[in-house]
Amino acid sequence: MKRKIVEHLGQVDYSGMVVPMAVIYKDPNGVNEEYVVRLWEGSTGKPTDIEVRTKTLCEARKAISRSGRMDCGIPRAECDDPAIVETWI
């Protein structure tokens, strides 16, 4: 899937989304030394094509907070992909 990279999640059109979620990853495959925030549609359990790339975890969290929608961060569960840091709902 070709990704659309935005500066923050406040730039996203959420119309048509039922349960937007953001997942923060640390150094996922192909993106070294970065945090990547991927926007997911929680109602389908599938990622969208939207992502934000930042240098720090703090910047990743700020990019999510600018959405004005997701304000609850949940730490990675033991069964999650090791690259996942947090999920925001």
Kindly label every feature range from the protein language model:
Residues 47-49, 61-64, 76-78:
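Glycine-rich loops and low-complexity Gly/Arg-rich segments
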Residues 45-57:
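A short, exposed loop/beta-hairpin motif centered on an aromatic-Gly-Thr core
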Residues 55-58, 66-70:
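Short C-terminal domain-edge/linker segments immediately following a structured domain
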Residues 38-42, 88-89:
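Secondary-structure transition/turn motif
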Residues 16, 30, 52, 83-84:
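Low-complexity, compositionally biased segments
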Residues 1-36, 43, 65-69, 75:
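Short N-terminal "domain-start" leader segments
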Residues 71-89:
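Short, mixed-charge low-complexity intrinsically disordered segments
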